Design a protein with these regions (language model features):
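Amphipathic alpha-helical dimerization/coiled-coil segments
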Residues: 2-6, 82-129
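N-terminal helix-turn-helix DNA-binding core of bacterial DNA-binding proteins
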Residues: 7-50, 74-82, 144-146
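Conserved alpha-helix/loop element of class I SAM-dependent methyltransferases that forms part
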Residues: 136-155
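Class I SAM-dependent methyltransferase SAM/SAH-binding core
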Residues: 158, 164-212
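A short acidic, Gly/Pro-enriched loop at the edge of an enzyme's catalytic core
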Residues: 211-223
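A short SAM/SAH-binding and catalytic strip from SAM-dependent methyltransferases
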Residues: 221-234
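A short glycine-rich, Lys/Arg-flanked "PGG" loop and its adjoining helix->strand segment in the class I
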Residues: 236-251
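C-terminal alpha-helical "lid/dimerization" subdomain adjacent to the S-adenosyl-L-methionine
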Residues: 251-307, 311-312
């Protein structure tokens, strides 16, 4: 057994004390479902923010959960320390699903997130590309995408969170068949019109959740997730779904913002995360069973601006 897999008596006792309280057990169960912000946990448990923060601090200090700030928000998730994971799993198994009220409240929070994001996209769909162009140089990003992906033809491309269909307009000409998936019907309408105008055929646009697509597994040569992950509560699940869709040897292309401090992106544009860091991406990639190929950064040409990160991965 590796030394990192051994917790030690003192740390074990601290971890047991950290979860040995009713509210902290409820927090542990909720964080087993997904990472959550402090204010989301406050709403779900219907307790004061200072009280919830105090419990989270104790659990974080004991190592059973991890704290990570993101701009003005703070998120928490279960620890993945190899010595603590068996203990956390055992506690969760013993707990079962007794707190169904908490899970119902979690679903309400998820629904509120989804409604806010969908409402935003329905409202801004007609001017989505203009909004994006305020922060990034599309031509430079698209040239980098072409460079990374190459010009070789592929059989099937799937664009998760296709939005206005820009990525399919760019990449679908090299594919025999392409699918664009999005939760916003208004966005899909624009994507259909855009690709039809461009004379592109063989593209199927579908309404659906990119975290659970219901598409056939091992069906895609290339999956694209373009400027989507920063909207998601669980980006790792999007990578897992992409990995499920990929054929062996298939590739995943991800484009998103690097970490930044522009709170306006959260306040006005419904971004849940202020960019995506390499550490998080590496964690999600590993959990999805994907292997890194290349990545690059495209800094802004003017301020305030956002650096764009592009990652290319493949499925062994």
């Amino acid at each position: 057994m590796k030394s990192g897999d051994i917790l030690g008596e003192t740390a074990l006792l601290e971890a047991l004390k950290a979860v040995g309280e009713p509210t902290r057990l409820r927090l542990l169960r909720l964080l087993a479902h997904e990472e959550l912000s402090v204010m989301e946990l406050v709403r779900i448990l219907n307790q004061s923010q200072p009280r919830i923060s105090r419990h989270l601090k104790l659990m974080n200090e004991a190592g059973v959960i991890d704290r990570f700030p993101d701009g003005a928000w703070v998120f928490y998730r279960l620890s993945e320390h190899p010595a603590l994971t068996p203990l956390i799993d055992a506690v969760l198994t013993a707990l079962g699903d007794e707190q169904s009220a908490d899970l119902r409240a979690l679903e309400e929070v998820r629904g509120q997130r989804l409604d806010a994001a969908q409402g935003y996209f329905e409202n801004i769909a007609p001017v989505w590309d203009q909004i994006r162009s305020h922060y990034i140089d599309d031509a430079e990003v698209e040239a980098a995408i072409h460079s990374l992906v190459g010009e070789d033809p592929v059989e099937t491309i799937i664009d998760l969170g296709t939005g206005s269909g820009r990525m399919l307009s760019l990449l679908a000409p090299r594919a025999q068949y392409a699918i664009g998936l999005d939760l916003s019907q208004q966005m899909l309408n624009i994507a259909r019109a855009r690709t039809r105008e461009a004379g592109l055929t063989g593209i199927d646009f579908r309404h659906g959740d990119i975290l659970a697509t219901r598409l056939n597994g091992q069906s895609a040569d290339l999956v694209v997730i373009h400027q989507v992950l920063h909207f998601l509560a669980d980006p790792g699940q999007a990578l897992k779904e992409a990995a499920r869709l990929l054929k062996p040897g298939g590739r995943l292309l991800i484009v998103d913002f690097a970490p930044h401090r522009l709170e306006v992106m959260r306040d006005e544009y419904q971004h849940r995360r202020l960019g995506i860091g390499d550490d998080d991406m590496g964690h999600w990639q590993k959990a999805a069973g994907l292997q890194s190929m290349r990545s690059l950064s495209l800094p802004p040409h003017q301020e305030p601006g956002l650096t764009v990160r592009i990652w290319l991965m493949h499925k062994a």
